[in-house]
C-alpha cells in the first residue's frame, strides 16, 4: 500500500544519506505517484491563484472531515483527478511599437506543451486561456483568439498553416482573468502533431477620444500580459469505482502495546522534497503498530479471518503467526507541486493517511 511504502521510505530517508538501494526505493515510490523522476524545478513559475484557491478549499474540507471524490473536480463540475496549469512558451509575432496611433497592440503566438499529460489520461476540461494583464484598461480592448491549423493542399503534395477564429470579443474593462473554453482543442492536442498553438491578437478599442493614450495602454498590456492554460484530466485506470468496504467502529484508546494508530508527521523538508512540493509543507500520515493478542477482542477491530487465525495460532503457535496490525481506514491528501516539466499541478493522492487500525 502507498502509505506503507511512504512510511518505510521516509523514516529511513530522514536519518541517512541516500545509498543506491534507497535511491532505487525513492524512484519506485515517485513512479507510483506518477513521476518519471524526482522533479528538480530550475525556474519554477508562480503558483496561479486559482490553484491556491482550490487547494485551500480542499484543505478546509479535509479539516471538516468531508470525504472528497478523488475522480471529480467539484470546483469545475467535471470528472477529473489532476489539475494542471501550463505556462505559455510562445513568442510575440508583432510586439508593441511606438506608433503614434497604433491599430494593433500586439500579436502573439501561444504555445502550451501538454506532453506531461499521460496517454491514459482523458482531458475533461481545458479552461482555455487565462489572459491576465494585471492592469486595468480604462477604455477596453478588442481581443481575437485563433487556432493554428495545418492544411494539406490537394494535388500539390505540400501543406500550409492557416488560422481558425475561436474568439472575437470586446472588453470594456479588463481587470480580472479571462477564460475561454478549449476542451476539444486540448483533447486534439494530445496528438503532438496537431498542437500548433494559438494566436492572440489585442487591439485598442476604436474610440477617437482614447487613441491619444493608446500607446501607454498597449505598452502596459505587453509588459504585464501573462497567459496560461488550465486543464483537468481523468485517468480511468486510477479512477475505478472502489469496492464497498466493510465498516468498522472507531477504536477507543487502548494499552500502549496493543494494535492502534500511532502519530507520524511527515515534513517534506526533512526528506529533501521542499523544492518541488509547494504545499502542504507536511502532513499527518500516521501508522499502525501494536500486538494482536489471542483472543481478539472487539476493540481490536479484527476481521473474521484474523479471529480464525488467532484461534489456529493458539493451537499451533510455532507454525501460524498472529494477525498483523494494519490500517483499516485511510484518507487522501491534496498536493500542490511542480512536475517534471515545471508545470504547477494540483492532485489528490488516495490512501496517504491512516485514520484507523485493526488486526488482519
UniProtKB/Swiss-Prot annotation:
Kindly name one Pfam family recorded for this protein: TGF_beta
Q: Please list the GO terms describing molecular function.
A: cytokine activity; growth factor activity
Q: Could you state one GO biological process linked to this protein? A: positive regulation of cell division
Residues annotated as signal peptide: 1-16
- UniProtKB keywords: Cleavage on pair of basic residues, Disulfide bond, Glycoprotein, Growth factor, Mitogen, Secreted, Signal
Paired cysteines (S-S): 259-325, 288-357, 292-359
Q: Which residues form the propeptide?
A: 17-246
Q: Has UniProt tagged this entry with the keyword Disulfide bond?
A: yes
Q: Where does the protein principally reside? A: secreted
- Please verify whether the record's keywords include Glycoprotein: yes
What subcellular locations does the record give? Secreted
GO cellular component entries: extracellular space
Name the organs or tissues of expression: Vegetal region of the egg.
Glycosylation is annotated at 113, 181, 301
| Protein family (similarity comment) | Belongs to the TGF-beta family.
Free-text function comment from the UniProt entry: Serves to facilitate the differentiation of either mesoderm or endoderm either as a cofactor in an instructive signal or by providing permissive environment.
Q: How is the quaternary structure described? A: Homodimer.
What protein name applies here? Answer: Protein DVR-1
Name of the gene this protein is made from: dvr1
Amino acid at each position: 500500500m502507498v502509505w506503507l511504502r511512504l512510511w518505510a521510505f521516509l523514516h529511513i530517508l530522514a536519518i541517512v544519506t541516500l545509498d543506491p538501494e534507497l535511491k532505487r526505493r525513492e524512484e519506485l515510490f515517485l513512479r507510483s505517484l506518477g513521476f518519471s523522476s524526482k522533479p528538480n524545478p530550475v525556474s519554477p513559475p508562480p503558483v496561479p491563484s486559482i490553484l491556491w484557491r482550490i487547494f485551500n478549499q480542499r484543505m478546509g474540507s479535509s479539516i471538516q472531515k468531508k470525504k472528497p471524490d478523488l475522480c471529480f473536480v467539484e470546483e469545475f463540475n467535471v470528472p477529473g483527478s489532476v489539475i494542471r496549469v501550463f505556462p505559455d512558451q510562445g513568442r510575440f509575432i508583432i510586439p508593441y511599437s511606438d506608433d503614434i496611433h497604433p491599430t494593433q497592440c500586439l500579436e502573439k503566438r501561444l504555445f502550451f506543451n501538454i506532453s506531461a499529460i499521460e496517454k491514459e489520461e482523458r482531458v475533461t476540461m481545458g479552461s482555455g486561456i487565462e489572459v491576465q494583464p494585471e492592469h486595468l484598461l480604462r477604455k477596453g480592448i478588442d481581443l481575437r483568439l485563433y487556432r493554428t491549423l495545418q492544411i494539406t493542399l490537394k494535388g500539390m503534395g505540400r501543406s500550409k498553416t492557416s488560422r481558425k477564429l475561436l474568439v472575437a470579443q470586446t472588453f470594456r474593462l479588463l481587470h480580472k482573468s479571462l477564460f475561454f473554453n478549449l476542451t476539444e482543442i486540448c483533447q486534439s492536442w494530445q496528438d503532438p502533431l496537431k498542437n500548433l498553438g494559438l494566436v492572440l491578437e489585442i487591439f485598442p478599442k476604436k474610440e477617437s477620444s482614447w487613441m491619444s493614450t493608446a500607446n501607454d495602454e498597449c505598452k502596459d498590456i505587453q509588459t504585464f500580459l501573462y497567459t496560461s492554460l488550465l486543464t483537468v484530466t481523468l485517468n480511468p485506470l486510477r479512477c475505478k469505482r472502489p469496492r464497498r468496504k466493510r465498516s468498522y467502529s472507531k477504536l477507543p484508546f487502548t494499552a500502549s502495546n496493543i494494535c492502534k494508530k500511532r502519530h507520524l508527521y511527515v515534513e517534506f523538508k526533512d526528506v529533501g522534497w521542499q523544492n518541488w512540493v509547494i504545499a502542504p509543507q507536511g502532513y499527518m500520515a500516521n501508522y499502525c503498530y501494536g500486538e494482536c493478542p489471542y483472543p481478539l477482542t472487539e476493540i481490536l477491530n479484527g476481521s473474521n479471518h484474523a479471529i480464525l487465525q488467532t484461534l489456529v495460532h493458539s493451537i499451533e503457535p510455532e507454525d501460524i503467526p498472529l494477525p498483523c496490525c494494519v490500517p483499516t481506514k485511510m484518507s487522501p491528501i491534496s498536493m500542490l507541486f511542480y512536475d517534471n516539466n515545471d508545470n504547477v499541478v494540483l492532485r489528490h493522492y488516495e490512501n496517504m493517511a491512516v485514520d484507523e487500525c485493526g488486526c488482519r
